[in-house]
Amino acid sequence: DEAGLTAAGRMLGYLEGLTKEDLVLCLISGGGSALLTLPADNIPFKDKQMVNEMLVKCGAPISEINTVRKHLSAVKGGRLGQSCMPARLHTLIISDVPGDDPSLVASGPTIPNTSKVSDALAILKNYDLSIPSSVLEHLKGKVEEKEGLSFFGTHSIIGSSKTSLEAAKSHARNHGIEVTVLGDAIEGESRVVGQNVAQLVLRENKQKHV
């Protein structure tokens, strides 16, 4: 929303004037994409919001949503990290994406972007969405540009869905509760996923918790 837009601008302001003697520590977690909102040049804020809403409603997995977000943002896809130069940068990541790809958590604001503009265009085409002209013009105008942002930085994954599930499983079993862990790779529209999980619960042993 507008608050996220203002916050992203202020964040970039804090990074001005850094030197190579400075150290920037970033804490990035799932949900950061929605909070860190600053559209790329020539994309109205409402158009970026519209694209995000359409991708969520059509059931696109978070990996695809974040791939598109990275190419429509002035801070995602490594651009926040590039703004930290020439300072040293270390990112602490709490991952909510299957596989814990750091470039996808919160759309990787401090991690070099490994996806291409053509990837974002392919995702939008696959779902046959009515994309605002400003977004299409921005993406098509970037296709021939060299992909990726080069800067030096390090990162550590300090928490993830997988470690959270294992901790919950261990805690439950320590209290005599038998559980079934479905893993951290489940993606899709919550309504559909919820139905699938409910069916599984009904089939499971009554003494187990899912």
Indicate where each model-derived feature is located.
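Solvent-exposed alpha-helices and their adjacent loops that cap or buttress functional pockets
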Residues: 15-21, 27-28, 64, 73, ...
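Accessory alpha-helical/coil subdomains and C-terminal extensions
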Residues: 87-90, 112-196, 203
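Glycine-rich oxoanion-binding loops at beta->alpha junctions
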Residues: 1-21, 63, 68-69
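Short glycine/serine/threonine-rich phosphate/pyrophosphate-binding segments
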Residues: 33-37, 74-75
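A glycine- and small-aliphatic-rich helix-loop capping segment at beta-alpha/alpha-beta transitions
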Residues: 39-50, 82-86, 111
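Short, acidic/small-residue loops that bind anionic groups at enzyme active sites
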Residues: 41-66
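A glycine/threonine-rich phosphate-anchoring loop and its flanking beta-alpha core
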Residues: 56, 62-128
